Amino acid sequence: MSIEGVFREGFVTTSLDAVINWTRTGSLWPMTFGLACCAVEMIHAGCSRYDLDRFGVVFRPSPRQSDLMIVAGTLCNKMAPALRKVYDQMAEPRWVISMGSCANGGGYYHYSYSVVRGCDRIVPVDVYVPGCPPTAEALLYGIIQLQNKIKRTNTIAR
């Protein structure tokens, strides 16, 4: 079988997709976008009790170094352009986790004039973590769900 036949059958690209997705799931570098009390639980998940490092999750200070944004807390109208600007500065491929009721849909402040009713109106969201505030276990579960989503994507054969 020639090399064209191998590519036509999809074996090489499928195997390469599996390797690339495996490396991406083991090296998620989130940038913290803590806006309210959910950020405390996000910090709690990064401490020694839950240890996000064992999943390959290392917090980065710059959007240019990160591939995951965790939006944690109430997003107000004034902060929405900054969220979009930081999202646009992130390198491809990039993912977003919306953490908490306020980031998911406005939460307790849903009817306030100054609150965005969900960060998915500003940036595309991959995983929603419910709760007010969500526990560190819920954030860990959301990260595991994102890793499973990344494993299912095809990066080469589109």
Swiss-Prot record:
InterPro entries: NADH_UbQ_OxRdtase-like_20kDa, NADH_UQ_OxRdtase_20Kd_su. Gene3D superfamilies: 3.40.50.12280. Its main location: membrane. Binds 1 [4Fe-4S] cluster. The keyword Lyase does not apply. One of its GO terms (cellular component) is respiratory chain complex I. GO terms for molecular function: 4 iron, 4 sulfur cluster binding; iron ion binding; NADH dehydrogenase (ubiquinone) activity; NADH:ubiquinone reductase (non-electrogenic) activity; quinone binding. It is an enzyme of class 7 (translocase). It comes from the Bacteria. The keyword Magnesium does not apply. Its cofactor is [4Fe-4S] cluster. Its EC number is 7.1.1.-. It catalyses: a quinone + NADH + 5 H(+)(in) = a quinol + NAD(+) + 4 H(+)(out). It is a peripheral membrane protein. NDH-1 shuttles electrons from NADH, via FMN and iron-sulfur (Fe-S) centers, to quinones in the respiratory chain. Couples the redox reaction to proton translocation (for every two electrons transferred, four hydrogen ions are translocated across the cytoplasmic membrane), and thus conserves the redox energy in a proton gradient. NCBIfam families: nuoB_fam, PRK06411.1. NDH-1 is composed of 14 different subunits. Subunits NuoB, C, D, E, F, and G constitute the peripheral sector of the complex. This is NADH-quinone oxidoreductase subunit B 1.
